[in-house]
Amino acid sequence: MDQAADTIWIAEQAKGIGFDLCGVVRAEKFPELENTKDWLKRGYAGEMNYLFDPRREDPRGAMPGVQSVIVCLLNYNTDHPLSLDAKPRGQEHDPRGWISRYAWGDDYHDVLKERLQALVVLLRERFPEPFEARAYVDTGPVQERVVAKYAGLGWLGKNTLLLNQALGSYFFLGVILTTLDLEPALGEGETPPPDLCGSCRRCLEACPTQAFVEPYVMDARKCISYLTIELRGSIPKELREPMGNHVFGCDICQDVCPWNRRAPASPLVEFQPRALPRHREKASEAASQAEEDSLFIPGLDWLLTLSQEDFRRVFRGSPLKRAKWRGLVRNACIAAGNSGIRPGGTSYARILVSLQKLAACDDATVAESAQWALSRIQ
C-alpha cells in the first residue's frame, strides 16, 4: 500500500469527521522537547507536577512500539467579542467575570476524544494488520504543540502557543499515537511552517502579569490561566490586581495576536457559550439578556452565590470543572475586588452580602480571597 496515499487518506478522513486540519509525524525526539528540561529546572511549571513526567521528553516513551503520531486540530473560535473588546454596559454597577473562550461550551476533551476514536475505527478498517493506537486530548505524556509543529500544522509563537496562518491559535489539538509506520505529512527535505511572528511583541507586552520571561518562554506561575485554573491555594497578592475580571483562564495573549484577528469562527454548537439558569432578580434589557444567561461574561453576583452543589450541576461536562468550586469562587472574589463597584450599584448589595458570607466560610482560601475583596470595595 502507498504510504503517502495513506497519509493523505488519514487527513481526508479526519476532515470528514470534523477536524479542521490533520498531520502525521514520526515519533521521535524533537529539539524543543529538550528545552523543556531547562524550563522545568527554572521552576516555571509551578505546581503542575505532571509536567515532570519523563515520558514527555520523547513521544517514543509514551507508548511501547509507537512509530507515528497523528495530530488533529479543531477550531473552537466563536463570533463573540474578544476579551479586550467585551465591555458590557454598566460594568461598574453590574460587574462580570471573563471565562476563557475555549471554556464557554462543552468540555473539549469529550468533543475531541469522540472524533479521535472515530478516526481510530476508520484506521482499523483501512489497515487490517494488528496495531496499537491511543488517543489523547491534553491528557497523555505528549507535548502536542511541538509534535503538531513537525506535523506541519503551524509554528510555535512568542506566546508559546501553536499558530496557524489560516486559523490563528483558537484551536484544540488531539493526538493518536500508533504503532503503524506512516509517511510523515512533511516530505523529505520539507521543514515545518516558518515562524511568522516577525518583530511583533504584542502578546509579550499585553500580558498584565508579565508572565513572559522572554519571547517563547513563559513563567506559568505568573500566567492568569495557571493562577485561575491550576493553582489550588491562594493567589499571590501582587498578582491579584493585574488579573482584572478573569475568573477562569485568559485569552489576552491570543486576543492581541494579529493572526487571530482574521481567525474564522467554528460552526460547532458544542463551543458556543453554555446557557445558564436565570440568575437575576430582575430581568435586564433584552439586548444583554443572552450575555447574562451564558458563560460569556457571566455576572459576578451569580458566581459568588454558587454552592458546591450548584457548581457540580451547572458545570457538568464543562472545562470549568477543573478549577473546582474553591478555585472558581476564589477567582470570582478576586474579580469582585478588582471590579471598582461602589455602594449604589445595581448589584453592590448582593455582592457585598455574598462576600461577607464567603469571608466567614470554612474554606480558608476562599475566605481570605473574600476578605481581600471586601477590603477593596467597602
Q: Which residues fall in each region the model found?
A:
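Iron-sulfur cluster-binding cysteine motifs and their immediate structural context
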Residues: 16-19, 202-225, 246-270, 354
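A short, charged helix-loop
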Residues: 179-182, 186, 218-231
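Short, contiguous, pocket-lining structural segments
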Residues: 168, 192-199, 215, 239-249
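Surface-exposed helix-capping loop/turn segments at secondary-structure junctions
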Residues: 21, 125-132, 213-214, 342-349
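Auxiliary alpha/beta "docking" domains used to position bulky ligands
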Residues: 1-196, 235
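Alpha-helical scaffold domains
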Residues: 235-378
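Conserved helix-loop functional segments at active or binding sites
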Residues: 182, 209, 213, 229-232, ...
